[in-house]
C-alpha cells in the first residue's frame, strides 16, 4: 500500500506543469520535471547514437538523449557502443586502436559517415537537450570531463559510471562537480548500492535500478537522500517496432513510473512523451 501511495504521489508530481523554462533549471530539477531519456536517441535505427537521431529525438520533444563514449588512440572522444568496430561499421579491430581520422573514415552500417565526436554533440545541444553519456572505459573519463568544462556543460551533461565503483572513483579523482548516474547490477549489486549511497555524494544524482536493487525500501532510501531513480523501460516490458500495420512503436514508460521510478529510459521517445502526457489520468485511477 505504501509503495502504491508513493507511486501515485510521484505520478502527480511528474504531471505538474513546469514554471520555468527547462534549460534554466538546475540539472536535478530538470530531470525531475522532464523524466524521459531517449536511449541512443531512439533505438534500433541505423543512426542510433548519432547526431541525426538525437535531432529527431529533440524534434519530438525528448528532454534527454543517451549515448556511449569511447576514446580514439589519439585522445578524441567519440560516440560508439561496442569495443570492436566490426559489427557496427565497415572497419575492424578495437575502437581504441584507431586514430580519430581513421575512425571518421569508417562508415556506420547503413550510413555514409562514421561515428560522431562528443564535442560535436555538445556544440549541437548547447543546453537545449540534456546529454546522458555512458563512460565505456576509464581512458575516456578525463577527456570527456575536459569537454564538459570547456563548454560549461555541468548543468546539462551527466555521466554514467556503470556497475561497481571503479569508474566512479576515476571520475571523482579528477572532478568533484560533474553529475553522475550509477547502475549497480549483478551479484554484487546490493553491496555497490549500499557503498554508493553511503558516500553521500550530492552530485551522484541518479541510481539506475535493476532487479537486484529494486525494492520499496531502496526507493525510499534513495528519495530520502534526494537522489533520482531511473530504469530501462524495455527491461520492464518489451518495447517493439511493429513491422505490420499500423506500424506503431510502443514504449513501456508508464510501467516504469508505476513502480515509483523517476526517470524512464526508452527506445521510443515519441510514445514515451505521449505516455507522460497521460500521467494525470493515470494518477487519478
Regions found by a protein language model. Name each.
Residues 8-9, 19:
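Cleavable N-terminal signal peptides
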Residues 15-16:
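N-terminal signal peptide c-region/cleavage motif recognized by signal peptidases
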Amino acid at each position: 500500500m505504501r509503495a502504491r501511495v508513493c507511486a501515485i504521489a510521484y505520478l502527480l508530481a511528474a504531471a505538474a506543469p513546469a514554471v520555468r523554462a527547462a534549460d534554466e533549471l538546475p540539472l536535478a530539477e530538470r530531470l525531475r520535471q522532464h523524466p524521459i531519456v531517449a536511449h541512443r536517441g531512439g533505438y534500433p535505427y541505423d543512426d542510433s547514437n548519432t547526431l541525426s537521431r538525437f535531432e529527431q529525438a529533440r524534434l519530438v520533444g525528448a528532454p534527454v538523449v543517451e549515448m556511449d563514449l569511447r576514446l580514439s588512440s589519439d585522445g578524441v572522444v567519440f560516440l560508439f557502443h561496442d569495443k570492436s568496430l566490426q559489427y557496427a561499421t565497415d572497419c575492424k579491430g578495437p575502437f581504441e586502436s584507431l586514430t580519430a581520422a581513421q575512425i571518421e573514415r569508417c562508415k556506420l552500417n547503413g550510413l555514409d559517415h562514421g561515428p560522431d565526436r562528443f564535442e560535436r554533440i555538445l556544440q549541437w545541444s548547447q543546453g537545449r537537450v540534456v546529454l546522458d553519456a555512458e563512460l565505456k572505459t576509464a581512458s575516456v573519463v578525463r577527456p570527456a570531463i575536459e569537454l564538459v568544462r570547456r563548454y560549461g556543460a555541468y548543468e546539462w551533461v551527466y555521466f554514467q559510471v556503470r556497475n561497481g565503483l571503479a569508474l566512479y572513483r576515476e571520475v571523482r579523482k579528477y572532478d568533484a562537480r560533474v553529475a553522475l548516474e550509477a547502475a549497480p547490477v549483478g551479484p554484487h549489486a546490493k553491496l555497490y548500492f549500499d557503498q554508493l549511497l553511503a558516500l553521500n555524494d550530492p552530485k551522484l544524482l541518479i541510481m539506475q535500478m535493476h532487479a537486484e536493487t529494486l525494492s520499496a525500501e531502496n526507493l525510499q532510501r534513495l528519495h530520502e537522500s534526494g537522489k533520482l531513480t531511473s530504469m530501462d523501460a524495455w527491461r520492464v516490458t518489451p518495447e517493439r517496432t511493429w513491422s505490420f500495420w499500423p506500424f506503431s512503436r510502443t514504449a513501456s514508460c508508464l510501467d516504469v513510473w508505476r513502480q515509483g521510478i523517476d526517470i524512464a529510459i526508452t527506445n521510443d521517445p515519441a510514445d514515451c512523451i505521449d505516455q507522460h502526457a497521460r500521467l494525470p489520468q493515470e494518477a487519478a485511477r
